[in-house]
UniProtKB/Swiss-Prot annotation:
Binding residues annotated for pyridoxal 5'-phosphate, in chain numbering: G110, A111, D238, E239, V240, Q241, T296
Gene that specifies this protein: puuE
Name of the molecule in the record: 4-aminobutyrate aminotransferase PuuE
Species lineage: Bacteria, Pseudomonadati, Pseudomonadota, Gammaproteobacteria, Enterobacterales
Activation/inhibition comment: Completely inhibited by succinate and low-aeration conditions.
GO biological process: gamma-aminobutyric acid catabolic process; putrescine catabolic process
Cofactor(s) required for function per UniProt: pyridoxal 5'-phosphate
Name of a matching Pfam family: Aminotran_3
Modification sites for N6-(pyridoxal phosphate)lysine: K267
Amino acid sequence: MSNNEFHQRRLSATPRGVGVMCNFFAQSAENATLKDVEGNEYIDFAAGIAVLNTGHRHPDLVAAVEQQLQQFTHTAYQIVPYESYVTLAEKINALAPVSGQAKTAFFTTGAEAVENAVKIARAHTGRPGVIAFSGGFHGRTYMTMALTGKVAPYKIGFGPFPGSVYHVPYPSDLHGISTQDSLDAIERLFKSDIEAKQVAAIIFEPVQGEGGFNVAPKELVAAIRRLCDEHGIVMIADEVQSGFARTGKLFAMDHYADKPDLMTMAKSLAGGMPLSGVVGNANIMDAPAPGGLGGTYAGNPLAVAAAHAVLNIIDKESLCERANQLGQRLKNTLIDAKESVPAIAAVRGLGSMIAVEFNDPQTGEPSAAIAQKIQQRALAQGLLLLTCGAYGNVIRFLYPLTIPDAQFDAAMKILQDALSD
């Protein structure tokens, strides 16, 4: 059956709200290669939206899941616990850059992790308010949509959203927003909208995902830490997209001296299996009463087995170092292209969490059309890319960190051609 035939069936069987970017259907995948039902091959620089830092079907991950399949697939951890969940929590506790002794709870999706981080913060503080940042993305459930600082397509037609959520600008040199602007906005909130003693948490992405890979300045993170300490507010770092070697360190927060109280994780944690988590200061994590946290599939044993494999792969294959090496090669390609492509307004990121932003060279305004044109040129040559950003004018790069050098070089050639056409 052809891609077009599957496409027509999709239109009849599934709602339009589940938007689909590609007009081809996956048949198989290995490492950084995706093959469709017609046999066409693509270099996958989307990785299921940052889920496959260790690549499609890494042999070690497949073996770990297959071994777990032979034992049991589900008990519901809250009913009958299992050792692998506890061991994974111990590993994350030892690795995560959070304040004080750590504890970890596992869930299923990134949005679920963020929801539970807010629950934990509210239980710990007894306060309702949460401050988030414009351009941030935290999920598609109602609380996480409220936290998300981007309207289209996530929020259209779904309001009203949960209250006691406030947004402030995220720093951006390109768009003229300084760290001080962000901090001044928080202080204005304290004066005009909610007193500091009613704020449970400040949540931020150290590198914004959907927002366009904007990197939090170290001065911002330090100032948030000071504000949280001063007012008894829980500091939450959302690492759903940035975690597990993508930025050149295991977590993006490893780039900063200041540590959050809670940290959310998902996506590449389990290499394609549905698993998320919240790790944080043990005293704060213990705030909810027994039964207050959990979920039927939370910490599913197959996904937990995959996560153990992911941590081993990252260590064994030195993927943090690999992320820095590949990211520098990508940055060099984009910076070189900038000399002859006036639409390139900025190249930014950490490690292999790199993005390029496009503006109209005539007006200087953000141009989603240029980003989409380059994305389509690349796709026509077999390179799968994703756009993002508040204006849809950013291309982000989320290749598996396990991609072979020759394939990465081929992708860079396609990218150069797409930028120069």
